[in-house]
């Protein structure tokens, strides 16, 4: 199985879960390879929430959906864009269980990508890898690098089953 096929199978597996919603940029309309994986996985449109470019608000909406009983897969096409949501990610999602003395524990799956440099580099602001930093900033969130095909489906399965939120980092050059 190729890397993209493993991603597609993972999206298909997630889409079968009743509580799952996919939220972000290019989830209903073409514009990024992550859209293609949702299409190839035949994720129903009613499970997709398209958003404009407002990353911090997207993270807040995803937290709200989680607190309302959904399991959002919040999609950030580039890791560089996820950094814009750091306020909600680091200060709210990661700390909410502690801040609420265990009353609230939102869970979501955050899907992001280190932009590919092949065949044409997108520029330094679209291909940075902040995986290690996110692990340090978010000690209560599982952060996984999807740097091998064999690890893709098990990592998404773990993210689904874990009581904690997860950040899954895909690599564009592996597509």
Residue ranges of each PLM-predicted region?
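Thiamine diphosphate
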Residues: 1-175
């Amino acid at each position: 199985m190729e890397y993209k096929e493993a991603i597609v199978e993972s999206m298909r597996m997630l889409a079968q879960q009743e509580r799952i919603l996919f939220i972000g940029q290019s989830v209903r309309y073409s514009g990024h390879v992550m859209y293609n994986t949702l299409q190839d996985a035949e994720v129903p449109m009613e499970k997709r929430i398209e958003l404009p470019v407002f990353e911090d608000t997207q993270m807040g909406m995803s937290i709200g959906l989680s607190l309302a009983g959904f399991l959002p897969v919040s999609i950030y096409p580039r890791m560089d864009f996820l950094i814009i949501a750091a306020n909600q990610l680091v200060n709210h999602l990661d700390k909410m269980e502690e801040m609420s003395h265990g009353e609230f524990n939102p869970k979501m799956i955050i899907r992001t990508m280190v932009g590919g440099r092949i065949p044409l580099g997108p520029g330094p602001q679209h291909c940075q890898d902040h995986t290690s930093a996110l692990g340090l900033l978010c000690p209560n969130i599982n952060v996984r690098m999807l740097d091998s095909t064999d690890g893709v489906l098990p990592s998404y399965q773990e993210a689904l089953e874990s009581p904690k939120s997860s950040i899954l980092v895909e690599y564009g050059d592996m597509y």
